[in-house]
């Protein structure tokens, strides 16, 4: 049997139990997209707040309402930076708030964006 998978845009809803590990990944994926995502049932620990603030520093717009986040991603900045010589070279100040998970995720992500990143 041959199976062909055709690429399509994704849309829909996924509900997962609150998990700090999954929350880091969900926030980062949404923040790197070039669309808007809503994530419900987020447990806002200090580590997750550090990841949220880091993604904001790269240009994502993140709004909180209760345990839900609406994230407009900064993915367009990554694409534009790769094709535009005049992309911003502003320094990104990232305060990981002593979150090892945030630091481990965000250091490699910082290489996607123009300009230096300083981690404190």
Residue ranges of model-derived segments:
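Short, structured segments at the rim of ligand-binding sites
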Residues: 1-120
């Amino acid at each position: 049997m041959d199976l062909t998978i055709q690429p399509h845009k994704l849309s829909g809803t996924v509900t997962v139990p609150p998990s700090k590990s999954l929350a880091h990944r969900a926030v980062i994926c949404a923040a790197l997209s070039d669309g808007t995502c809503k994530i419900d049932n987020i447990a806002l620990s200090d580590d997750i707040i550090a990841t949220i603030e880091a993604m904001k520093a790269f240009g994502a717009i993140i709004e909180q309402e209760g345990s839900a986040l609406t994230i407009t991603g900064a993915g367009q900045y990554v694409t534009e930076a790769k094709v535009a010589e005049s992309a911003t070279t502003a320094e990104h100040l990232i305060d990981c708030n002593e979150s090892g998970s945030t630091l481990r995720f965000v250091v490699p992500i910082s290489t996607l964006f123009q300009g230096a990143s300083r981690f404190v």
